[in-house]
Amino acid sequence: MRIEVIRREENLLEFYLEGEDHTFANLLTETLHENEHVTFAGYTIEHPITMARKPRFKVVTDGKITPEKALEEAAQKIFDRAREVLEAWKAAIE
């Protein structure tokens, strides 16, 4: 996974997330939508063949937090949820 910043402003961030596809892109977008300070979060895959594993994201906040902070919080939520799934799985197979 590699992040390439395209545009950065006070409450806007556009970037490519190289090495990922719709699976992680959807998860990240939906998690960003849970943040009350995120006014827009979305992604596109510009070409289904040549850019299939390089979604382009746009994150806009209300200015109370930065888009970078919103991404940090979303990444932590995803990590925490994955840990919960792992723990539930371990409990189920014991």
Curated annotation (Swiss-Prot):
GO terms for molecular function: DNA binding; DNA-directed RNA polymerase activity; protein dimerization activity. Keywords: Cytoplasm, DNA-directed RNA polymerase, Nucleotidyltransferase, Transcription, Transferase. GO terms for cellular component: cytoplasm; DNA-directed RNA polymerase complex. It catalyses: RNA(n) + a ribonucleoside 5'-triphosphate = RNA(n+1) + diphosphate. One of its GO terms (biological process) is DNA-templated transcription. It is found in: Cytoplasm. InterPro entries: RBP11-like, RBP11-like_dimer, RNA_pol_Rpb11_13-16kDa_CS, Rpo11-like. The keyword Nucleus does not apply. Its EC number is 2.7.7.6. Pfam families: RNA_pol_L_2. The keyword Membrane does not apply. Part of the RNA polymerase complex. PANTHER family: DNA-DIRECTED RNA POLYMERASE I,II,III, DNA-DIRECTED RNA POLYMERASES I AND III SUBUNIT RPAC2. DNA-dependent RNA polymerase (RNAP) catalyzes the transcription of DNA into RNA using the four ribonucleoside triphosphates as substrates. Belongs to the archaeal Rpo11/eukaryotic RPB11/RPC19 RNA polymerase subunit family. This is DNA-directed RNA polymerase subunit Rpo11. It comes from Thermococcus kodakarensis (strain ATCC BAA-918 / JCM 12380 / KOD1).
